[in-house]
Regions:
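Catalytic-domain carbohydrate-binding cleft regions of carbohydrate-active enzymes
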Residues: 1-269
């Protein structure tokens, strides 16, 4: 309520993964709500634990995941969700081994982000929401129907990557997805005190000011040392440098500040 009074809408990041230690894992596995493997172990990611993907092509799995988010977030006022990891990002990429409710992964994996977005769109609509928008890391044919705001994912902090975003944004618009953005400054490889990166950030920020969505997001180095490598048996993340507009020196800040106010003047339109 305090944030909303300030004009700020909180967005909660949701991953489509479930740890084998989760209280929900047993039920989801027994009911066939997870992506499975035709051979070997179905663990598809070991980042922050041994995790499995929920099967976004399965209507029952969609309903189950939404019910958890409704109970833990929606009922407390959250109305917008950030659907990360929506490719999904397998490790390893053995697409001939994974199987969905909709069929073998080789036939239907690209539809995963469509089902992921539909899960939240249908849930929010059934809850009575009429203005729905979900931030999603990728999209596919059909995503247009489910109120997606797509961004281009974990891209490099290079001028080449910035140039590629112009192409990507034009393609998304022609595909019927008007809400699109990229991580201003790129996501990977930006060093806060590197003059070359600061130049890239300024140019990207100037362009980003006129994109459909204006968003800074990314890992900024150098990284801090971990206080603990593991807690229990889960490897801990560390934190990078600040990514606020004032994190890159006074000269850069004055330029970014200028374009922040340009964007604010444009916002009513």
């Amino acid at each position: 309520d305090e944030l909303k009074a300030m004009g700020v809408e909180t967005v909660v990041s949701v991953w489509p993964t479930i740890d084998e230690k989760s209280v929900n894992f047993g039920e989801m596995a027994e009911r066939g709500l997870l992506v499975t493997a035709d051979r070997g172990n179905a663990i598809v990611m070991t980042w922050m634990g041994n995790t499995f993907f929920f099967d976004a092509t399965n209507p029952e799995a969609q309903a189950f995941v939404w019910e958890q988010c409704k109970k833990n977030y929606y009922q407390y006022g959250i109305r917008c969700f950030w659907l990360d990891e929506s490719e999904p990002e397998y490790g390893p990429y053995d697409f001939d081994n994974y199987r969905y409710y909709a069929g073998p992964a080789l036939q239907c994996t690209n539809t995963y982000p469509v089902g992921y977005a539909k899960c939240f769109f249908d849930g929010l609509r059934e809850a009575g929401e009429t203005e729905i928008l979900s931030l999603v890391r990728c999209a596919w044919a059909g995503s247009q129907k489910y109120a997606v705001l797509t961004w281009s994912g974990d891209i490099s902090s290079t001028f080449r990557a910035m140039r590629e975003q112009l192409q990507a944004g034009l393609s998304m618009g022609m595909a019927g997805i008007p809400w699109w953005t990229s991580d201003i400054g790129g996501f990977l490889g930006g060093q806060v005190d590197d003059p070359a990166f600061r130049e890239l950030l300024v140019r990207w920020f100037q362009w980003g000011c006129f994109c459909p969505v204006f968003r800074m997001h990314g890992e900024r180095s150098p990284w801090y040392e971990r206080e603990q490598e593991y807690i229990g048996d889960v490897r801990q993340l560390t934190s990078g440098q600040g990514n606020e507009v004032w994190s890159f020196g006074d000269e850069v800040y004055e330029i970014l500040r200028k374009y922040l106010f340009v964007r604010e003047r444009m916002r009513p339109y």
